[in-house]
Amino acid sequence: MCIRDRSCCNVREVANPRGPGNAVLIEIASSGVSELFVGLGAPQIRAEQVARNVLKKAKAYIGMENVPVGLHLADQIMLPMGLAAAQGETSSFVSMPLTQHSLTHKTILELFLDVAIDIEENGPATKVTIRPRA
């Protein structure tokens, strides 16, 4: 893991920036998935705090064993999997606990597509199965 190895880090100053804030991006890539954690600066928030917040989220993801899908990727992959389920294919993934956004996305997909989305919570891991509605 590269968390303490500065050779895998890149700090870039932008000449003529178009905004007043900073951005922190942490990408964690593995053989099957790539997760990107983003923090954007805001007025009255120190750059160090922005970085700490993003690092906290990245460390939480790294600390989850056998959970390839992060918090904000879950809702994004539900749409193509939902479309596949509407065509008769069943698929699943394991994620961190779903966000409210993902749960809302689940409800919308079930309303507009003829699919069922099952959620099985197993400790900190959540298995999501998207299948054709029976």
Label every PLM stretch briefly.
Residues S7-G70:
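A glycine- and small/hydrophobic-rich beta-loop-beta segment
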Residues T90-A134:
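C-terminal functional modules
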Residues V50-L55, L71-Q87, T107-F112:
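Proline/glycine-anchored alpha-helix kink/cap motifs
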Residues E13-R18, D75, G123-V128:
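A glycine-rich phosphate-binding loop feature that marks nucleotide/adenosyl-phosphate handling sites
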Residues L25-E27, P80, K127-T129:
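Beta-strand secondary-structure signal
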Residues G21-A23, A74-M78, D114, A125:
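Active-site lining segments that contact anionic ligands and/or coordinate catalytic metals
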Residues M1-I3:
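Short, small-residue-biased leader/transition segments that mark boundaries at the very start
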Residues K57-E65, D75, A84-S95:
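Structural motif
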